[in-house]
Amino acid sequence: MVASIEDAAEYGERADALVSGLLGRVMRQRRTVAAALDYIRALSRETRANCWELAAAAGHKGPYRMQALLGRRRWSWEKARDALPGLAQDVLPDDPGDLIGPGLAFDETAHLKKGKSTACASPQHAGVTGKVENCVTWVFAALVTTLGQAWADFDVYMPDCWAKDAARRAKAGIPEDLAFATKPELAIAQAKRLVKAGLRVLWAAADEVYGRSGEFRAALRALSLAYVVIIPCDYRVTLAEGRTVRADEAIAGAVFERRSCGNGTKGPRYGGWALIATADPRESLLIRRLDRAENKYTFYLCWAPEDRPATMTYFITIAGRRWPVETTFRTGKDALAWDQSQARTYDAICRHTALTALAQLRTAAIQGALAGAGVLPAAPAASQDTQGTPDETTVNPDDLAIYTGTAPLPAVGGQPCPPGIRPIGLSAAETSRIERLARDWKAGILTTVRLAFQLRWSAWRRRHQARARWHHYSTRLAAPAT
């Protein structure tokens, strides 16, 4: 199948209409819906997720609408999160011919931070670097089907040091009634929310952070979700004959079969697999031996309800569907700049994540439509407040001017900032950016209107930096010498 660029544009408009309809049920004001849709579409471009760059990508004259969207505008990110399962099921429909059907993959990922002011940021293990980092950790539940994967639910993990510090919580806007919860407890809450919301899922997969939790596995059983969860090698398992052993001690009596758990980027993911019965007739110990690495093993606890086959093939297939949650993290970080947000308060970081989840589903909808695997409803006529084009389309000669002067510094501390302060001088990075714009404009890649828009943004950024520098210098010069 071959799709045209016109198809891509049409599917983008249809996906916008789908997301806009959802936003309209979450947000009361049309301008908030329009700003949120602009935010989501801007995330889909190659840009950093700070309000300045998102606003420029969306065609706004300044960052104020984006800042208000994450801050003072009245809307509930929790309602937006609750709407994710319905949209996810529409975008990633079930394949009737799939052996295991749709399921959930749980995992956590870190959003690295420099300072200590961001809500829930603290030194903790970050899987992205493999060491302790100052970061915010999130727990995600991804809907996984044969058509793709996307975030269906999320929670921010609040470390114990934050949970016990009332003053710090209040400053970051963390609700007083939000209690500390472990990562498995957050995943349990997500599974319950998703099943209650009517999302059709049949299984769950997770790594050892969740697999070692008996409460997590019990919750999945109560929800009739088959599971394949990783456990550590020293986890004790009671075998069918009644003997309790470490998981790695069961290797001695295991008979391995070479099978594939799915296709990867380099072909089928083969490995040696062995299924060992446990004292629970519906639960088994699954062992994977990495291909060409005889001393590397992964251990799983597997369970299936009575109406599903508790076979090796069934469990291996589920085990292979855990990896797509990592794909959602790569999409969120690499394609949608989720981890580059400069939001700090609790509501702001959760709003940004909710909007990123919608951006991920929007992308999945377009991807499925282009591949011929999904159907998007026809989009209504676009309104003026959701076009995402530059606010001004007229070009004056001054709009193409490049301000190269340097803003003045305050001679005396405490002086007010001049109302018409000049921008700061051109940095090397800004010079390179402007030269690239000029080159694209001369080659006909960039229109004059878009060039003028980008130059206005350049002047705005540097004038804003000049005002900030003025206030910093003025404050320091006014401070008494020590």
Regions found by a protein language model. Give the residues of each.
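Catalytic-loop motifs flanking and including active-site residues across diverse enzymes
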Residues: T137, P324, T328, C350-A357
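A short, flexible helix-boundary coil/loop motif
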Residues: M1-R31, L43, M158, A172-K183, ...
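Non-catalytic, well-ordered alpha-helical scaffold segments
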Residues: A34-L37, W52, T298, T313-I316, ...
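A glycine-rich, aromatic-flanked flexible loop/lid motif
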Residues: I287-W303, R321-L336
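Short amphipathic alpha-helical "interface-anchor" segments enriched in bulky aromatics
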Residues: A110, Y210, P309-Y346
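Short, surface-exposed beta-edge/turn micro-motifs
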Residues: I100-G101, W138, R282-E283, K296-F299
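Conserved, well-structured functional cores that handle cations and Mg-NTP chemistry
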Residues: V2-A204, V209-A226, C233-R236
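Extended, non-catalytic structural segments that build the interaction scaffolds
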Residues: D38-A42, K296-R322
